[in-house]
Amino acid sequence: SGCCKHPACGKNRC
């Protein structure tokens, strides 16, 4: 889990 650093992660981005 955590945040994603690329736009494909959608609303789970940093």
UniProtKB/Swiss-Prot annotation:
The keyword Secreted applies. A non-hydroxylated version of this conotoxin has been synthesized. Hydroxylation of Pro-7 seems to increase the inhibition of rodent alpha-1-beta-1-delta-epsilon and alpha-1-beta-1-delta-gamma nAChRs. Residues 5-7 are annotated as: Lacks the Ser-Xaa-Pro motif that is crucial for potent interaction with nAChR. The modification 4-hydroxyproline is found at P7. This is Alpha-conotoxin PIC. Belongs to the conotoxin A superfamily. It is found in: Secreted.
